[in-house]
Amino acid sequence: MATEIPPAVRNDLDRLRQLEDQLQAVLLRKQQYEGELRNVDKALNELNKLPQDSKVYKVVGTFLLSTTRDEAIQDLNQRKELLDLHLQSLVKQENMLRKQISELENKVKQVLAAGQGGQVQ
């Protein structure tokens, strides 16, 4: 006779799947921000090589606008700060989710190993 998974364990497994989905979403956003941060760093590196009185262009929507080198550097530094803050937040979320996943996995393993199936005795 097949053993049925108790409702409490089923709920824990559902919660585990939700946490893993959330972790994947956080990791994807983190990866996107890291890519954007690399692009910002490359742009800053190139701008810093230019003479101070250089004119540069930036894309705003569907327009290409002229700006000064210093304004472009300032804009990119602000964007970099914002990306760093987002990344710090995502790292905290990632760590929290990993901890919750680990705790829930251990709980489910203990219940299943004990053969109690989550039932109260």
From Swiss-Prot:
Q: Which GO terms describe its cellular component?
A: cytoplasm; prefoldin complex
Signal peptide location:
none
Q: Which domain of life is it from?
A: Archaea
Where does this protein reside within or beyond the cell? Cytoplasm
Identify its protein family.
Answer: Belongs to the prefoldin subunit beta family.
Q: Which Pfam families match?
A: Prefoldin_2
Report the main location listed first in the record.
cytoplasm
- Name of the protein this chain belongs to: Prefoldin subunit beta
